């Protein structure tokens, strides 16, 4: 639904390879049973309901169904984290890009090597995994594209284990170098 660009994928592949060389067991793919389109729909509905709460017109039953789906997603993640310490996900579909506010957000696009992509694929898609379930997510820098643009990775951890994702980010930084300030900010 929101595949990352080739240059971002290359940075992730280098990161995963380095983790494997360090002795980590890496399982590729999302948890079995995770209905990504339904998760995105539920997250979008709950976010819209929250934003429009002052105009509560939507039937309460729809909110209850969405909340029930959120609890099912949370249970799926709990099961996943019984056999995995963390899950690594993209933060966005591209590396850094110029900000353009000349169009309404729904009409904005981002130029990528693969062509124009909807702006709204950039952030909301990947954050739904942690946000809908209410599990911790930490973002860490993992490298630069060929053009020198920064790429981050999202580290998800079990519910109430915020320290796990933060500690993994610190260990990852030790292994792959962590944040590198742009030349104009390096001292």
Could you tell me what each predicted segment is?
Residues 9-25, 119-121, 126, 131-187:
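Structural helix-boundary/capping segments
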Residues 28, 87-89, 139:
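Structured core elements
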Residues 2-6, 67, 115-116, 158:
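A generic secondary-structure micro-motif detector
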Residues 1-4, 95-96, 162:
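Short, acidic Gly/Pro/Ser/Thr-rich loop/turn segments
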Residues 1-40, 63, 144:
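Gly/Ser-rich, acidic/histidine-flanked active-site/gating loops
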Residues 38-52:
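Charged, often glycine-rich, active-site loop that binds/positions anionic groups
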Residues 4-5, 38, 97-100, 149:
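Short glycine-/acidic-enriched loop or helix-start segments at secondary-structure transitions
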Residues 23, 48-132, 184-186:
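Serine-dependent amide/ester hydrolase catalytic core
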């Amino acid at each position: 639904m929101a595949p990352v660009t080739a240059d971002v994928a290359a940075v992730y592949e280098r990161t995963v390879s380095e983790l494997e060389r360090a002795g980590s067991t890496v399982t590729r793919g999302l948890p079995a049973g995770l209905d990504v389109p339904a998760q995105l729909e539920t997250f979008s509905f709950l976010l819209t309901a929250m934003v429009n709460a002052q105009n509560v017109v939507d039937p309460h039953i729809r909110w209850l169904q969405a909340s029930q789906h959120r609890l099912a997603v949370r249970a799926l993640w709990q099961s996943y984290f019984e056999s995995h310490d963390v899950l690594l996900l993209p933060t966005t579909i591209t590396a850094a890009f110029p900000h353009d506010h000349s169009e309404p957000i729904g009409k904005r696009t981002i130029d990528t090597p693969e062509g124009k992509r909807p702006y709204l694929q950039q952030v909301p898609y990947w954050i739904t995994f942690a946000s809908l379930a209410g599990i911790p997510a930490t973002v860490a820098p993992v490298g630069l594209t060929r053009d020198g643009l920064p790429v981050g990775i999202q580290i998800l951890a079990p519910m109430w284990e915020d320290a796990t994702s933060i500690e993994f980010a610190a260990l990852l930084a030790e292994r792959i170098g962590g944040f590198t300030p742009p030349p104009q900010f390096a001292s």
